Regions:
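Compositionally biased, low-complexity flexible segments
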Residues: 287-324
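Extended active-site and interfacial segments that coordinate phosphate-rich ligands
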Residues: 36
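Thiamine diphosphate
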Residues: 9-10, 14-16, 20-31, 39, ...
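Ferredoxin-type iron-sulfur electron-transfer modules in oxidoreductases and energy-metabolism complexes
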Residues: 51
């Protein structure tokens, strides 16, 4: 708000955001909400690119708007902290990158009976790509993968179109970018993010049908990326199960297929909701019984019961406290 009030311009690169991309830093550096906090600031442009070509397009546009056009906007761009291969840019994708979403990898199966659309942003886009392969190879589901570079841009565009249409009833209605991208699609829609579920929910009203939202609601934890993503239910296997569940809900496949996938992937359907697992010492008064049980089970498995970095007994004197 201070930067907006001062009419600041510029680009801020966030190297540590994302709930699951920075290993071993627990609550303090596992940010799952900064993109949500960007929503109320009108002059802040917030992007979560997955690949170098997306980042280049966003920065180039940011320099044009702030330095050339002298527009009073500033940028928050999260690049997370995970190394992975950088692909080449799909032809004609730059407009979608700047407006918030584009189709990164089509399924390649135009006549498939079972269709799905997977949406990822930042490092979680790689989980969507892995889920695309699993769905195609094991379940004959043709899934297109979409990159969402900015939930805020999509939300602001959608609400702006809604406002115009409400106040200009006799003029041609405007169509939000989300709806333009998806107007000729069918199937089910699954969105996965390294941030809270409120982000994908914020644009769901402009989808052809209600999408399934996967996110990282809850406290940050100290573990490997793969274990964190399994715990927060945003890894490729959870994306596959969410897709199969949506197909079963509309009657396209039987529910036994979903149950079989849950068992095959080693997903515990009785695991506690991640947002209820506090991560404190067993027996803490502020933990529910289910959350304590989930923490103990996960610690025994070495998987998802990850203690936060500060989950340790502090000296009685108050000296030697963690200084992180």
């Amino acid at each position: 708000w201070a930067a907006g009030d001062m009419r600041s311009r510029g680009i801020k690169i966030g190297g540590t955001p994302g709930r699951t991309t920075l290993n071993g830093d627990g609550l303090q550096h596992q940010d799952g909400n900064s993109h949500r906090l960007a929503d109320p600031v009108p002059t802040l442009k917030a992007y979560d690119p997955a690949f170098a070509f997306e980042l280049a397009a966003i920065i180039k546009d940011g320099i044009r708007r702030t330095d050339v056009e002298q527009e009073d906007v500033f940028y928050y761009i999260t690049v997370e902290n995970e190394p992975y291969a950088m692909p080449s840019q799909p032809e004609g994708s730059e407009e979608g990158i700047l407006r918030g979403m584009y189709r990164f990898r089509p399924s390649g199966s135009e006549n498939a009976e079972l269709r799905a659309h997977l949406f990822g942003s930042g490092a979680i886009l790689n989980e969507a790509l892995r889920a695309q392969e699993i769905l195609g190879e094991r379940y004959n589901v043709a899934a297109d993968v979409w990159s969402i570079t900015s939930y805020k841009e999509l939300y602001m565009d959608g609400t702006d179109c809604d406002r115009f249409n409400r106040l200009h009833r006799d003029e041609e209605h405007r169509t939000p970018w989300v709806r333009q991208c998806l107007e000729d699609t069918d199937g089910v829609y699954v969105m996965a993010t390294d941030y809270v579920k409120a982000l994908p929910h914020s644009i769901g009203k402009w989808f052809p049908k209600q999408p399934v939202a996967l996110g990282t609601d809850g406290f940050g934890r100290s573990e490997s990326r793969s274990a964190l993503r399994r715990f927060f239910e945003v890894d490729a296997e959870h994306i596959v199960v969410a897709t199969l569940g949506a197909l079963a809900a509309q009657g396209s496949i039987d529910r036994e297929t979903v149950a079989s996938a849950i068992a095959e992937f080693g997903i515990d359907p009785e695991a506690p909701n991640p947002v209820t697992v506090r991560g404190g010492r067993d027996g803490d008064d502020d933990q529910s019984a289910g959350a304590r049980r989930g923490s103990r089970q996960c610690r025994r498995r070495g998987g998802a019961g990850f203690r936060r970095r500060h989950d340790r007994r502090k000296p009685e004197s108050g000296r030697g406290r963690d200084r992180k």
